C-alpha cells in the first residue's frame, strides 16, 4: 500500500510538472503556433488520460489480486486455526476419555486417595496422641496440685501442733518460773525466820547475861523456845519435803507430758510417713495404671492401624486380583477375537477361492454355452475361449488387487491403531506424571510402595529427591530392626 501511494504521488508530481511545462510552452508559443500547440496539447491530454485509465485499471487489478491473496491467506489461517482447535479439542476429548477409562490412572488415583487417607489417619492419630498427652499432663497437674494442697495442709497442721508445743513449753517455763518464785519466797521466808531466830537468840543471850538469876525460869522458857524451834525445823523439813515431793510430782507430770508429746509427735510422724507411703503407693499405682492404659491404648491403636492397613492391603490385593482377572479376560477375549478373526479370514479366503473357482467355472460355462449357441467353428471358438479366459483372469486380477488393497488398508488401520495406542500410553504417562507432581509433595511419607518408577524422580527438585530417599532409608532401617527383633 505504501508503494502504491508513493507511485501515485510520483505520478501526480509528473503530471504537475507536465502541466507546468505545457503552460510554459503555451506561454512561449506564438500565436500562429497556437492551433498546433492546442493539437499537441490535446494529444498529450489524450495520452495522459489513456495512461490514467491504464493505471486505474492496473491499480484495480492489483487491488483485486491483493484482496484475493488476503482472502486466501485469511481462509488458510482460519482453516489452520480450525484444524488446531479441532486437534486440540480432539486431544482434550481423547485425554478425558483416557483419564476416565484408563485402569492405570484409576489405580494411581486410588493409591493417591489411599495416601490421603493415610495422611488424614496419621493426623488424627497424632491429634489423639496430643489429646492423650494433654489429658495425662492435666491429670499430673491435678495430682501435683492435690499433693501440694495436702502438703500445705500438713504444714499448717504441723504449724498448729508446733504452736501448741511451744505453748506447752511456755506453760512449762512459766510453771518453772512460778516454782522458782515460790522457792525464792520460801528462801526469803527461811532467811526471815533465821533473822527472827537470830533476834531471838540475841534476846535469849541478853536475857541470859542480864539475869542469871532467873536462869531456871529462862531455862524453862528456853526449853519452850527450843521446842518451838525444833517444831519449826520439823515443820520446815516437812514443808521442804512436801515442796520437794510437789516439785518432783510436777517434774514427773512435765516429763510425762513431754513423753506424751514425744509419743504424739512420733505417732504424727508415723502417720505422716504412712500417708507419704500410701501417697507414694497410690501415685505408683496411678502411674502404673496410666502406663498400662497407655500401653493398652497404644496396642489398640497399633492393632487398629494394622487392621486398617491390612484391610487396605487386602482391598488393594483384591482390586489387583480383579484388575488382573479383568486384564486376563480382556487378553483372552482379544486372543479369542484374533483367533476368530484369523479363522474368519481363513474361511473368507477359502470362500473367496471357492467363489473364484465357481465364478471361473460359471463364466467358462457361460462362455461355452454362448459358443454353443452361436455355433461357431473351432477356430473362432478357441479365440473366443482365449478372450473369455483373459476376461476371467482380468476379473480375478481385479479381485486380487481389491484383496491386496483391503490387506493394505488393514495394515494401515493396524498402524493407526498402534500409533493410537502409543499416543494413549503417552497421554497416560503424562497424566500420571501430572498427578504425581500435583500430589506427591503433599503426600511424602504416606505414598504406598511401587507408586514411583526409577525415572519419575528426575521430574522433581533436589529437596524432594533427598527427602524421598531419606524416607526410603528410614523405612528400610525400620524393617531391618523389625526383622532383628523377631
Curated annotation (Swiss-Prot):
<dbReference type="Pfam" id="PF13868">
    <property type="entry name" value="TPH"/>
</dbReference>
<dbReference type="GO" id="GO:0031514">
    <property type="term" value="C:motile cilium"/>
</dbReference>
<dbReference type="InterPro" id="IPR026504">
    <property type="entry name" value="MNS1"/>
</dbReference>
<comment type="function">
    <text>Microtubule inner protein (MIP) part of the dynein-decorated doublet microtubules (DMTs) in cilia axoneme, which is required for motile cilia beating. May play a role in the control of meiotic division and germ cell differentiation through regulation of pairing and recombination during meiosis. Required for sperm flagella assembly. May play a role in the assembly and function of the outer dynein arm-docking complex (ODA-DC). ODA-DC mediates outer dynein arms (ODA) binding onto the axonemal doublet microtubules.</text>
</comment>
<keyword id="KW-0963">Cytoplasm</keyword>
<dbReference type="GO" id="GO:0051321">
    <property type="term" value="P:meiotic cell cycle"/>
</dbReference>
<comment type="similarity">
    <text>Belongs to the MNS1 family.</text>
</comment>
<protein>
    <recommendedName>
        <fullName>Meiosis-specific nuclear structural protein 1</fullName>
    </recommendedName>
</protein>
<keyword id="KW-0175">Coiled coil</keyword>
<keyword id="KW-0966">Cell projection</keyword>
<feature type="coiled-coil region">
    <location>
        <begin position="52"/>
        <end position="198"/>
    </location>
</feature>
<keyword id="KW-0282">Flagellum</keyword>
<keyword id="KW-0206">Cytoskeleton</keyword>
<dbReference type="GO" id="GO:0005930">
    <property type="term" value="C:axoneme"/>
</dbReference>
<dbReference type="InterPro" id="IPR043597">
    <property type="entry name" value="TPH_dom"/>
</dbReference>
<dbReference type="GO" id="GO:0005879">
    <property type="term" value="C:axonemal microtubule"/>
</dbReference>
<keyword id="KW-0539">Nucleus</keyword>
<dbReference type="GO" id="GO:0044782">
    <property type="term" value="P:cilium organization"/>
</dbReference>
<dbReference type="GO" id="GO:0005634">
    <property type="term" value="C:nucleus"/>
</dbReference>
<keyword id="KW-0469">Meiosis</keyword>
<feature type="coiled-coil region">
    <location>
        <begin position="230"/>
        <end position="440"/>
    </location>
</feature>
<keyword id="KW-0969">Cilium</keyword>
Amino acid at each position: 500500500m505504501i508503494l502504491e501511494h508513493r507511485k501515485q504521488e510520483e505520478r501526480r508530481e509528473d503530471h504537475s510538472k507536465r502541466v507546468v511545462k505545457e503552460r510554459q510552452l503555451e506561454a512561449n508559443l506564438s500565436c500562429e503556433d497556437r492551433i498546433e500547440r492546442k493539437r499537441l496539447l490535446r494529444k498529450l491530454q489524450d495520452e495522459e488520460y489513456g495512461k490514467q485509465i491504464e493505471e486505474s485499471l492496473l491499480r484495480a487489478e492489483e487491488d483485486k489480486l491483493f484482496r484475493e491473496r488476503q482472502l486466501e491467506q485469511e481462509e488458510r489461517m482460519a482453516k489452520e486455526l480450525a484444524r488446531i482447535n479441532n486437534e486440540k479439542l480432539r486431544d482434550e476429548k481423547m485425554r478425558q476419555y483416557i483419564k476416565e477409562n484408563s485402569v492405570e490412572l484409576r489405580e494411581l488415583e486410588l493409591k493417591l486417595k489411599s495416601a490421603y487417607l493415610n495422611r488424614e489417619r496419621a493426623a488424627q492419630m497424632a491429634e489423639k496422641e496430643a489429646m492423650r498427652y494433654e489429658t495425662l499432663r492435666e491429670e499430673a497437674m491435678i495430682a501435683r496440685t492435690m499433693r501440694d494442697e495436702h502438703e500445705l495442709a500438713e504444714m499448717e497442721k504441723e504449724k498448729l501442733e508446733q504452736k501448741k508445743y511451744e505453748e506447752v513449753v511456755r506453760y512449762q517455763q512459766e510453771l518453772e518460773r512460778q516454782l522458782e518464785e515460790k522457792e525464792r519466797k520460801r528462801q526469803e521466808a527461811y532467811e526471815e525466820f533465821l533473822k527472827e531466830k537470830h533476834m531471838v537468840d540475841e534476846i535469849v543471850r541478853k536475857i541470859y547475861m542480864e539475869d542469871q538469876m532467873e536462869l531456871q525460869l529462862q531455862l524453862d522458857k528456853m526449853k519452850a523456845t527450843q521446842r518451838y524451834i525444833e517444831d519449826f525445823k520439823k515443820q520446815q523439813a516437812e514443808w521442804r519435803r512436801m515442796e520437794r515431793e510437789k516439785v518432783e510430782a510436777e517434774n514427773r507430770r512435765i516429763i510425762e507430758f513431754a513423753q506424751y508429746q514425744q509419743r504424739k509427735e512420733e505417732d504424727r510422724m508415723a502417720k505422716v510417713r504412712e500417708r507419704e507411703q500410701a501417697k507414694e503407693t497410690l501415685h505408683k499405682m496411678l502411674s502404673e495404671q496410666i502406663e498400662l492404659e497407655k500401653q493398652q491404648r497404644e496396642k489398640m491403636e497399633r492393632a487398629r492401624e494394622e487392621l486398617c492397613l491390612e484391610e487396605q492391603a487386602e482391598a488393594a490385593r483384591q482390586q489387583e486380583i480383579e484388575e488382573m482377572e479383568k486384564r486376563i479376560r480382556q487378553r483372552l477375549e482379544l486372543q479369542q477375537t484374533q483367533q476368530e478373526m484369523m479363522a474368519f479370514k481363513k474361511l473368507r479366503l477359502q470362500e473367496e477361492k471357492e467363489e473364484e473357482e465357481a465364478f471361473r467355472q460359471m463364466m467358462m460355462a457361460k462362455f461355452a454355452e454362448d459358443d454353443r449357441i452361436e455355433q461357431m467353428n473351432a477356430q473362432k471358438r478357441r479365440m473366443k475361449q482365449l478372450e473369455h479366459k483373459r476376461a476371467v483372469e482380468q476379473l480375478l486380477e481385479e479381485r486380487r488387487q481389491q484383496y491386496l488393497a483391503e490387506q493394505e488398508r488393514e495394515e494401515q488401520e493396524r498402524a493407526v491403531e498402534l500409533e493410537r495406542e502409543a499416543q494413549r500410553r503417552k497421554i497416560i504417562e503424562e497424566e500420571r506424571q501430572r498427578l504425581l507432581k500435583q500430589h506427591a509433595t503433599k503426600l511424602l511419607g504416606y505414598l504406598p510402595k511401587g507408586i514411583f518408577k526409577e525415572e519419575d524422580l528426575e521430574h522433581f527438585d533436589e529437596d524432594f529427591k533427598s527427602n524421598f530417599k531419606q524416607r526410603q532409608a528410614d523405612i528400610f532401617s525400620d524393617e531391618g530392626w523389625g526383622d532383628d527383633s523377631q
